[in-house]
Amino acid sequence: MSVNVKDFGAIGDGIADDSPAIQKALDSGSTIVEIPEGNYRIVTTLKVSSFTRIEAAKNARIFSCGDTPKHQGDLLLTNSDFERGNTQISICGGIWDGNNTGKFNTKNPDLFAPDAWSGTVLNFFNVANLVLEDFVIANSVVYYARFGKINNFVIHNIGFQSDFPGFNQDGLHFSGYCRNGLIENVSALTKGQTNDDMLALNADDSMERLENRGLLRGPIENLTFRNVFAEDCYTAIRMLSVTAPIRNIRFENIRCGCRNYAINMDAARYCRTPLFDAKDYPKGVGDISNIVIDGMEVWKTSERDVPLIVNETNSENIIVRNFRRVMERDKCPEVPTIVTQNTIPLATSFRNELFQ
């Protein structure tokens, strides 16, 4: 059974507040909710229940109103039940727009302000059998999409675009208890995006920061990423572990120009909000294991003097195959490709040459 949001009063003119009408459609009990072409201004967070599929037209733009103040918990769209969880939520199509030029769509300079909103466009927490496909996430204030406690999920054919760079503009941000997922065909559509980690696997993080409230520290495991492209992102991949494990992760066909890192495993040592005091961990931190990176082409797009791969995390069984640094495109060829420090001996196998 399908319904159309316009049958519930949605206008799609970019002026009317369409959030009540779209929410009525989502709450109607229909398994498919259709959003036709148009510009849908969203004032209050859209909440999606279990057994719901949103089918949005390719040019349906669903955007966050910039004229209303934002508070903790405000998002463009999220699942409905964080406590008991949701299952079988699908979103296909559309442009999901954080509208980062809106008057009130800004990041609070106080990272710990009690009522500050996260600045995230799409949020999924405690969801099983999630499918996200064939859409664009645009103009995020902070994260484009964030995930916590999700299991058995598929994300494919997702693009990121933004007219302006933003602080901590992660692409797909995974926190604790994300398990058993396939993520494929992910592209930055705008040069310069994403303006932070394109793929962030943060098993540990500062959960007191406004971006991360409501997420959890915990294991991240059994994920496959393939076909990831960015012309000029900040960092392609971050794996952040202090005590929580990241394990059984596979990356295939990653092709990214990077201003900062291609792979960042620095355990957030240099972050504004560090997660530990190094003096308390004389043998280092981290628990990363069974990582395969097969088919990666990267190049530096800035002259920043940092390696493409930085490892300062205890880890084992990291296998890198078919890695190529594209020197003819590299703006800082003199910097090392990889630096490892502050760890116990690392079991890493590099297969094929780093430089081709």
Regions found by a protein language model. Name each.
Residues M1-Q356:
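Extracellular/periplasmic carbohydrate-active domains that bind, remodel
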